[in-house]
Amino acid sequence: MNLIIDIGNTVAKVALFDRTSMVEVVYDSNQSLDSLEAVCNKYDVRKAIVATVIDLNECVLAQLNKLPVPVLWLDSHTSLPVINLYETPETLGYDRMAAVVAAHDQFPGKDILVIDAGTCITYEFVDSLGQYHGGNISPGLWMRLKALHQFTGRLPLVHAEGRMPDMGKDTETAIRAGVKKGIEYEITGYITAMKHKYPELLVFLTGGDDFSFDTKLKSVIFADRFLVLKGLNRILNYNNGRI
């Protein structure tokens, strides 16, 4: 079994893969990894990969360093099954690259736009030759809602869930509709522009936030909430024998 440890800005995910098939995923605190020991005792883990976008505290580091299997710590020097053309690979978030790797692994030989709607919304492009050209970073749903509250004097902090008319009927619905529809239009705009350049473009959407798209747009999107975990597993398998 492969142990995949994905430590994000808000939560950690601990997943188990049997070769290329995901067996289980556990959501955990990124400050403690309480589930790690139980997961390791439950399965016959042979190797692991650790990927983090935050600085790990001593408790988490101690747990990871006690893992009784070879561990691949994902960084800018890790060998990848795609060609990385990013000019500053040391600043590239592991989650961005892992999502690209997973999408390319599923559809090699295709031009692919990968959209990850999480804390931030990222847009990544990998071409049919497996060359990762880079991507863009935009504020995510919660970040936009929070910014409207923090950087103004009177706008309230609005929850993402709730009534959302086409045009807001009060301040709460105006903020919710403005932010969520703004994100939907942004994503639609990226897809439209990229498909103009690459008519056979495939689109992957992952991340924790769900958005509504019209029927025509839905037909070109592959939604996969576990794309990053699958990419990390692919990277671990690709580096088999190097750890």
UniProtKB/Swiss-Prot annotation:
SUPFAM superfamilies: Actin-like ATPase domain. ATP binds at D6, I7, G8, N9, T10, V11, A12, K13, T119. Gene3D superfamilies: 3.30.420.40. Pathway: Cofactor biosynthesis; coenzyme A biosynthesis; CoA from (R)-pantothenate: step 1/5. Substrate binds at Y86, G93, Y94, D95, R96, T171. GO terms for molecular function: ATP binding; metal ion binding; pantothenate kinase activity. The active site is at D95. It catalyses: (R)-pantothenate + ATP = (R)-4'-phosphopantothenate + ADP + H(+). Its EC number is 2.7.1.33. A monovalent cation. Ammonium or potassium. K(+) binds at D116. GO terms for cellular component: cytoplasm. One of its GO terms (biological process) is coenzyme A biosynthetic process. Keywords: ATP-binding, Coenzyme A biosynthesis, Cytoplasm, Kinase, Metal-binding, Nucleotide-binding, Potassium, Transferase. It is found in: Cytoplasm. It comes from the Bacteria. Its cofactor is NH4(+); K(+). Pfam families: Pan_kinase (PF03309). NCBIfam families: baf, PRK13320.1-6. Catalyzes the phosphorylation of pantothenate (Pan), the first step in CoA biosynthesis. Homodimer. Belongs to the type III pantothenate kinase family. PANTHER family: TYPE III PANTOTHENATE KINASE. This is Type III pantothenate kinase. It comes from Bacteroides fragilis (strain YCH46). The lineage of its organism: Bacteria, Pseudomonadati, Bacteroidota, Bacteroidia, Bacteroidales. The gene is coaX.
